[in-house]
């Protein structure tokens, strides 16, 4: 490969390394405080509110949202709530308020009628 083609490639690689060094590392795992980070929508502003759980107030966890790191209310149990494609039949009342009210690995999630109940999460 000619040297004239290597110069732009080297410049791009150097720029990439500099950008990586500018972003503070984020644990993203939230291992310091109980619970797990919820599934968050990507924040295009690349907000860096925290680097670790201890940077967040009270029970909030430092969680990744795309290129951002924000303090967020944690989920108590692993997994995410399944999507609801259509209204489902069943009891249309709230059967739980938080994951800890659900047995085993089940989570407290929205059901088909706008209320919440214990369901098997997606992993």
From Swiss-Prot:
Compartments, as annotated in UniProt: Secreted
Q: Which UniProt keywords apply?
A: Aspartic protease inhibitor, Disulfide bond, Glycoprotein, Protease inhibitor, Repeat, Secreted, Serine protease inhibitor, Signal, Thiol protease inhibitor
Leader sequence range is 1-28
Return the PROSITE patterns for the record: WAP
Could you name the domain of life of the organism this protein comes from? Eukaryota
Gene Ontology terms: cellular component: extracellular space
User: Can you tell me which residues are glycosylated?
Assistant: 45
Q: Which Pfam families match?
A: WAP (PF00095)
* Tissues where this protein is expressed: Epididymis.
Does the record's keyword annotation contain Membrane? no
Please name the SUPFAM superfamilies in this protein's record: Elafin-like
Q: Which InterPro entries has this protein been placed in? A: Elafin-like_sf, WAP_dom, WAP_four-disulfide_core
GO terms, biological process? antibacterial humoral response; innate immune response
Give the disulfide map. 37-63, 46-67, 50-62, 56-71, 81-109, 92-113, 96-108, 102-118
The protein's job, in short, is: Broad range protease inhibitor.
The protein depicted here goes by the name: WAP four-disulfide core domain protein 2
Q: Give the gene symbol.
A: WFDC2
């Amino acid at each position: 490969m000619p040297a004239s083609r290597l110069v732009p490639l080297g410049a791009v690689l150097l720029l990439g390394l500099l950008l990586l060094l500018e972003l503070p590392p984020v644990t993203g795992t939230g291992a310091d405080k109980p619970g797990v980070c919820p599934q968050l929508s990507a924040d295009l502003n690349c907000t860096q509110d925290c680097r670790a759980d201890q940077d967040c107030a009270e029970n909030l966890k430092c969680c990744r949202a795309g290129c951002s790191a924000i303090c967020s209310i944690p989920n108590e149990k692993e997994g995410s709530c399944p999507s609801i494609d259509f209204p489902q039949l069943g009891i249309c009342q709230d059967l739980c308020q938080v994951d800890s009210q659900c047995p085993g690995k089940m989570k407290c999630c929205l059901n088909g009628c706008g209320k919440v109940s214990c369901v098997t999460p997606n992993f």
